[in-house]
């Protein structure tokens, strides 16, 4: 929609454009306007509140051209979804078009908390789907929603069952496990102590590394996680 495109161009910061381009190097720099996240978020909130019908029309017009249009779309899902099922429909339409980690990870859907059981079932669908960032989104949502009171040990095996080569999927898996080691050590540490190791070597070692980088664990835990690292093994 031309009005939205022009609005985003008016909000752009040329200095920020170069910085943002470095964060998502797989995106053509000419398709990044340089709108800062807080500015885009404020615009999305105003747009969703004052023009919800136009916002939903915009969300139906896929694919978008600019990186910021995709980010706006992601923000609008969280703002406009009335139920988990409403969000699922929006996400199933949008996620196949997501082409970078930043757009994927900015999507926050508060209504998921209304029905975690149904959301978990949907996450299980996403992580076995084909689109790269649909899988990543599923892992990120499992990390966001299911590592506290809703955690179940079987979730560790769920993420382990993902057998993909894409870097940004496996980074999300490592991110998930690093938080599991921090938040659910009684279950996650024995998971990492298994022989043979339950993950591919890269994800296993990256998970331990990211956990060691946290300030939330003790020096003793960091040393132990270092001792678990696989020095050399075939993936």
Predicted regions and their residues:
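Alpha-helical scaffold domains
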Residues: 1-235
């Amino acid at each position: 929609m031309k009005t939205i495109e022009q609005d985003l161009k008016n909000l752009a910061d040329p200095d920020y454009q170069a910085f943002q381009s470095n964060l998502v190097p797989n995106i053509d720099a000419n398709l990044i306007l340089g709108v800062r996240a807080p500015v885009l978020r404020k615009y999305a909130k105003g747009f969703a509140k004052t023009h919800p019908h136009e916002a939903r029309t915009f969300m139906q017009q896929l694919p978008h051209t600019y990186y910021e249009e995709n980010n706006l779309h992601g923000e609008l899902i969280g703002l406009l979804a009335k139920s988990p099922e409403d969000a699922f429909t929006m996400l199933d339409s949008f996620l196949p078009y997501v082409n970078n980690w930043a757009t994927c990870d900015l999507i926050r859907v508060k209504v998921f908390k209304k029905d975690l059981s149904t959301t978990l079932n949907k996450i299980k669908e996403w992580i076995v789907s084909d689109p790269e960032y649909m899988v990543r989104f599923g892992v990120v949502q499992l990390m966001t929603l299911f590592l506290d009171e809703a955690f179940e040990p079987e979730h560790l095996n769920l993420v382990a069952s993902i057998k993909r080569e894409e870097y940004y999927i496996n980074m999300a898996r490592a991110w998930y496990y690093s938080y599991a080691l921090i938040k659910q050590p009684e279950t996650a540490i024995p998971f990492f102590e298994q022989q043979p190791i339950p993950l591919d070597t890269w994800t296993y070692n990256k998970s331990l590394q990211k956990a060691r980088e946290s300030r939330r664990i003790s020096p003793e835990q960091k040393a132990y996680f270092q001792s678990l690292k696989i020095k050399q093994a075939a993936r």
